[in-house]
């Protein structure tokens, strides 16, 4: 092996040790390009490190999106905005700046099924992941079951601390299934712990006056609504269902 190739292999070996993925995979071609174009040492080093940083940023975005556990990837750019309910159209521009995360505010998207609530929530979540925030998506029924299991296993405090690492938690489908007092109390505690510290997005098919049907406790219902809506964005997503319109169109 020539001295040149030995040097390339040593560069790659060092890059692997330092977890420099781009340098490890592209050292040879980058060095060849620098020699061919008579690139200065400082320009070569700057170019190489910039590409390493770009790769890490991109990998970080993909990793955060994967860890968020979205059921599918829906982007804000895919929304047919003129078909959203009026309140959703009016407030989306403010929400997509993600200032609500910086300000530790919540979002409640309330309206009948099929109007874009979950799409907006996931779209905001993916954008947050791409901007460096830690996000978790979970349906409310699954969340309550997880909380109840942790209580049975005496690990609730550990689970609450784990939830605290997330800048944004999306709690989808509140209202589709009611739960008992224990489940309501556990969910209330989680929401209270995040209040004014981290952001939460709730999607629900029920207006606030019907939330007692979920929690079966008027005092707890009032307390949860108070925690969620304090300094929050409440979006009225009542309107014609996207899915119903698509189904009717297919039947024509």
Per-segment meaning from a language model:
Residues 102-107:
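Pre-Walker A (Motif I) flank of P-loop NTPase domains
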Residues 109-111:
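Hydrophobic anchor at the beta1->P-loop junction of P-loop NTPases
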Residues 16-71:
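Interdomain "pre-motor" coupling segment immediately N-terminal to P-loop NTPase/helicase cores
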């Amino acid at each position: 092996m020539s001295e040149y190739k030995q040097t390339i292999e040593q560069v790659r070996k060092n890059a692997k040790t330092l977890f420099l993925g781009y340098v490890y995979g592209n050292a040879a071609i980058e060095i060849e390009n620098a020699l061919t174009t008579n690139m200065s040492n400082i320009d070569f080093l700057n170019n190489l490190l910039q590409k390493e940083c770009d790769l890490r940023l991109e990998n970080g975005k993909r990793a955060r999106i994967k860890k968020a556990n979205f059921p599918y990837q829906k982007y804000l750019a895919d929304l047919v905005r003129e078909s959203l309910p009026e309140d959703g159209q009016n407030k989306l521009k403010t929400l997509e700046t993600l200032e609500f995360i910086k300000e530790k505010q919540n979002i409640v998207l309330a309206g009948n099924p099929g109007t874009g609530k979950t799409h907006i929530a996931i779209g905001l979540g993916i954008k947050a992941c791409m901007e460096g925030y830690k996000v978790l998506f979970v349906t409310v029924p699954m969340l309550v079951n997880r909380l109840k299991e942790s209580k049975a296993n005496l690990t609730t405090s550990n689970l609450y601390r784990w939830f605290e690492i997330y800048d944004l938690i999306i709690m989808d489908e509140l209202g589709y299934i009611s739960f008992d007092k224990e489940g309501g109390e556990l969910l209330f505690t989680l929401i209270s712990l995040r209040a004014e510290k981290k952001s939460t997005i709730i999607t629900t098919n029920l207006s606030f006056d019907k939330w007692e049907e979920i929690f079966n406790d008027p005092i707890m219902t009032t307390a949860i609504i108070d925690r969620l809506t304090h300094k929050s964005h409440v979006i009225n997503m009542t309107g014609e269902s996207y899915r119903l319109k698509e189904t009717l169109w297919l039947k024509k």
